């Protein structure tokens, strides 16, 4: 599981790892959801900064879970996920001080083998779906605390793209040698 706030290299890393291991990766559902929603709006109503209404949170989480379940049907030994339901919960708590009960229920049905928490030591890139570098830092701290509080297995990856890739490979080789070294 590639985990972390916005603009920390999760998507790039997921793509690189899926190519390296000749497997599939699951993109972040929220990005597709927002792109589709914004594409359906007339140009005059599109905004510079995209926001998500609290009423949309559950549908986004359902879409995230459905996409994760679909990719698991590939029967690959190793899969890479660019974000997950835990991220949905953290963002819901951050922006609305509330995690919808439906998301809490869905969280109890998922299990990820390992989390790679992507550090914020790479340059933040603007995107209408991203708020700011300052919020990225705040969310990174919340995500680290979440992993610790929930006793989830994780490793922090940092540095350049190549350094991050090599760190993930090293952890995978040590934690999952029977899968990685096939």
Over which residues does each language-model region extend?
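A glycine- and Lys/Arg-enriched "phosphate-lid" helix/loop adjacent to the NTP-binding pocket
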Residues: 95-161, 176
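Short amphipathic alpha-helices and their capping/turn segments at secondary-structure boundaries
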Residues: 14-19, 57-76, 99-112
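Conserved nucleotide-sensing/catalytic segment adjacent to the nucleotide-binding pocket
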Residues: 44-90, 94-95
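The conserved Walker
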Residues: 6
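Hydrophobic anchor at the beta1->P-loop junction of P-loop NTPases
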Residues: 2
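Conserved substrate/cofactor phosphate-moiety recognition/catalytic segment
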Residues: 15, 19-63
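Conserved lysine of the Walker
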Residues: 10
């Amino acid at each position: 599981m590639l985990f972390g706030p916005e603009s920390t290299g999760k998507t790039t890393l997921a793509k690189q790892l899926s190519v390296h291991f000749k497997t599939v990766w699951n993109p972040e559902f929220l990005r597709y959801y927002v792109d589709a929603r914004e594409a359906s709006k007339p140009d005059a109503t599109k905004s510079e900064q995209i926001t998500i209404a609290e009423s949309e949170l559950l549908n986004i989480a359902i879409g995230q879970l459905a996409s994760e379940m679909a990719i698991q049907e590939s029967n690959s030994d190793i899969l890479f996920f660019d974000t997950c339901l835990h991220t949905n919960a953290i963002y819901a708590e951050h922006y609305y001080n509330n995690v919808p009960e439906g998301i809490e229920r869905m969280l109890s049905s998922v299990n990820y083998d390992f989390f790679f928490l992507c550090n914020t030591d790479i340059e933040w890139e603007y995107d209408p779906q991203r708020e700011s570098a300052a919020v990225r830092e705040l969310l990174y701290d919340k995500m680290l605390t979440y992993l610790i509080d929930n006793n989830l297995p994780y490793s922090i990856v940092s540095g350049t793209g190549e350094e991050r890739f090599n760190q993930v490979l090293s952890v995978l080789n040590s934690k999952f040698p029977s899968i990685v070294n096939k």
